């Protein structure tokens, strides 16, 4: 069931994105498997363009309080896109037991890994003392899935 939840949430992201940013572009990069388990040649799930910003977005869903970085198999590929002006690289994460949708910039994940952390925890969200940037995506639960408003992503700065 969890895999079905994840795939349906991933498929819902473009609809919410287009509702949030009318006239924007969001393109799904279909998985091109390399032949090895859980590997893909594509750097992310979606490439989106809105209001002069390019977004490289990996979409993940996870049960529980934490999202282990070991589940982010695209980390190395995504990392090669860090540092470009007006390009936002990160993960849209749905912790479905908490009805929480968040955006975690890849630079935050990079810093967490450098600090020895192995995962993103729900306690980091909305925590003023958390030194890592994690952005709550305003969302409303509709039966199972969340309707998300991605407009908060316009406030991201270079490096987020």
Question: What name fits each language-model region?
Answer:
Residues 29, 56-59, 92:
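Short, conserved beta-strand edge motifs with alternating hydrophobic and charged residues
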Residues 42:
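Beta-rich catalytic cores
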């Amino acid at each position: 069931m969890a895999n079905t939840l994840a795939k349906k949430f991933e498929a819902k992201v473009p609809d919410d994105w287009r509702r949030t940013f009318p006239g924007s572009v969001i393109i799904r990069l279909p998985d091109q498997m390399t032949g090895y388990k859980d590997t893909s040649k594509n750097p992310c799930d979606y490439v989106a363009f809105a209001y002069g910003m390019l977004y490289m977005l990996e979409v993940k869903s996870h049960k529980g309080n934490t999202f282990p970085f070991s589940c982010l198999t695209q980390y190395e590929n995504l990392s090669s896109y860090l540092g470009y002006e007006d390009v936002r690289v990160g993960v849209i994460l749905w912790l479905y037991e908490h009805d929480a949708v968040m955006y975690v910039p890849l630079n935050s994940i990079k810093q967490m890994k450098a600090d020895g952390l192995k995962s993103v925890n729900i306690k980091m969200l909305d925590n003023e003392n958390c030194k890592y940037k994690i952005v709550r995506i305003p969302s409303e639960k509709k039966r199972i899935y969340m309707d998300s408003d991605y407009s908060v992503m316009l406030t991201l700065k270079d490096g987020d």
